[in-house]
Regions:
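Predominantly extracellular/luminal carbohydrate-interaction, adhesion, and secreted-enzyme modules
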Residues: 1, 238-240, 267-268, 321
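Extracellular/surface-exposed low-complexity segments
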Residues: 1-73
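Long, low-complexity, Gly/Thr
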Residues: 5-11, 16-17, 137, 327-330, ...
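Outer membrane beta-barrel translocator domains of Type V secretion systems
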Residues: 55-232, 337, 342, 347-349
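Solvent-exposed, glycine/polar-rich loop segments of beta-barrel outer-membrane systems
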Residues: 67, 117-123, 156-158, 192-210, ...
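Outer-membrane beta-barrel strand-turn architecture
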Residues: 96-97, 134-138, 174-178, 224-228, ...
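Outer membrane beta-barrel transmembrane domains
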Residues: 169, 226, 255-358
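Solvent-exposed flexible segments
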Residues: 232, 237-243
């Protein structure tokens, strides 16, 4: 036999045989070959190696230490002490309400707090102010004043501070006509804070930070009067404050504080009533600091850390007050105020004063 390939329309390949006599060929049907049964090999699962267990994992703490937060509280405390002392333009306000010109004094006290960026402070303070004012021929009422504030601070981990702030200033009140007015005031002074910062285990660092401060502000208002003595008075205020920088030591740590400038604005609404020789009023205000960042560097040995304290924010307040004139030359005034919201929040503050005209 022999092997041949036959190709036709349907192709088939295999063996053929033929006969020698007549040359006839026959196709030899191949024997079927069985298909082997698949025998897959089982897959052995791979067990991942266990991760090693760290019996003492490292837990990262805050970037700034409790000592740094205590020092930062003292620095911000100075700024808020100046804000409490110099930013209310109080004397121009009572002159606008009808207080006579002359020699005057005001004493009061209260609380305020500040929380933000890891610090939490509470301050009790006493404030004394006094001055003299008079009317001019140009339609302005002008005066000068001195102010003093003393406060006790509480910081995190029983840290503490003793604040002192002193300022001298000038102010003016101008009637613009049509029941409109403008108040101007400028103050310059110095603030200091003798502080002790503590950590979780009571270790303390003590020091004193001081800075010169400057403020100038303006207020515009319009009085809408009614026949029964009631009035409504919308107000708008804008002020600019600058603090000089300071460099001081707190124990083994050296601190370098940059100067800071801040611009703040406020809107208020006063509702009151005049009667005979006096008046009473209620006032609500919303204030916003548009700028201000305190940059501080803390150096211990060869290590220096830096913090930024943002002073921008909004706070609201509420006040009640009044005045009464005994005669043309002697008058008393008082007010009660509190903060409603904000990082800087005043607690209840009580103030009283008198004016004597020569």
């Amino acid at each position: 036999s022999s092997y041949k390939k036959a190709l036709t329309t349907d192709q088939k390949e295999g063996d053929i045989t033929w006969k020698d006599g007549n040359g006839q060929g026959s196709y030899v049907v191949p024997e079927p070959k069985p298909t082997p049964t698949p025998d897959p090999k089982p897959v052995t699962p791979v067990t991942p190696a266990p991760k090693p267990v760290n019996p003492n994992p490292v837990i990262r703490g805050a970037y700034d230490t409790p000592h740094m937060r205590g020092i930062r509280s003292a620095v911000v405390g100075n700024i808020n002490a100046w804000r409490t002392l110099a930013d209310d333009m109080y004397r121009p306000r009572v002159l606008q309400q009808g207080e006579p010109t002359g020699i005057w004094a005001r004493i009061g006290g209260g609380k305020y707090s500040y929380s933000g960026s890891g610090i939490d402070t509470a301050i009790d303070y006493t404030r004394i102010q006094g001055g003299y004012d008079a009317k001019t021929g140009s339609g302005w009422t002008v005066g000068g004043q001195v102010s003093y504030l003393r406060g006790n601070d509480d910081y995190v981990f029983n840290g503490s501070g003793k604040e002192k702030a002193f300022a001298v200033g000038a102010y003016g009140v101008k009637d613009l006509g049509k029941d409109q007015y403008i108040h101007l005031e400028s103050q310059v002074g110095r603030v200091s804070n003798a502080f002790t910062a503590r950590n979780e285990i009571g270790e303390s660092l003590s020091g004193e930070t001081k800075a010169n401060a400057y403020t100038i502000g303006a207020r515009y208002g319009k009085t809408v009067k009614f026949q029964n003595g009631t009035y409504i008075e919308p107000q708008a205020q804008l002020s600019y404050t600058h603090f000089d920088g300071d460099s001081f030591d707190a124990g083994r740590m050296h601190v370098n504080e940059s100067g800071v400038s801040s611009t703040a604005g406020g809107l208020g609404l006063e509702i009151g009533k005049t009667f005979g020789a006096g008046n009473i009023y209620t006032r609500v205000g919303v204030n916003h600091a548009f700028s201000g960042t305190v940059n501080t560097a803390y150096t211990t040995g060869n290590t220096t850390k830096y913090t930024k304290q943002d002073l921008k924010g909004t706070w609201t307040d509420l006040a009640f007050g009044g005045r009464y004139g005994f005669n043309a030359n002697n008058s008393i005034f008082a007010d009660l105020s509190t903060g409603l919201s904000g990082d800087y929040k005043a607690g209840w503050s009580v103030n009283a004063g008198f004016t004597h005209k020569f």
